[in-house]
């Protein structure tokens, strides 16, 4: 348990939904959530060489919606946000001077972004038509999802899925063994 500055107990420092008063000026106080709505879980923050082009690609390939963009004095995107379905994703142009490096500079990325979508088949066709590289073709999986994996032109890897079936842990282990996979 943690003590708040007001003496109340918090059950966790994470997912704290308490509201905090912030004063904008002498006459007005705003009440804000410590964790903004829609950002309760992990939010990927992508470093991209060519962030403006990437935003346009994500709109075309994945149906992304741009929710904000801030350019720096040098014209590079200092911060932007998009949504793919309900998933919030932050991104910015690569800034080597602060060690914010893109997959292209690093020679790839070990991170895969996983997002559930309503129709993986439609998204896959749209992504491929927009120029995404298919890394794993769309297929039904033993764990109940239909999935596909793609690399964007900027070096980020995306794993999209549509959940098709609830599978118990025991059944999942049986199916994995039958498929020759790990349990």
What residue spans do the PLM features occupy?
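Local alpha-helix boundary/kink/capping signal
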Residues: 17-18, 50
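Vicinal oxygen chelate
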Residues: 23-49, 55-56, 62-151, 160-183
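C-terminal catalytic core of tyrosine-transesterase DNA break-rejoin enzymes
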Residues: 154
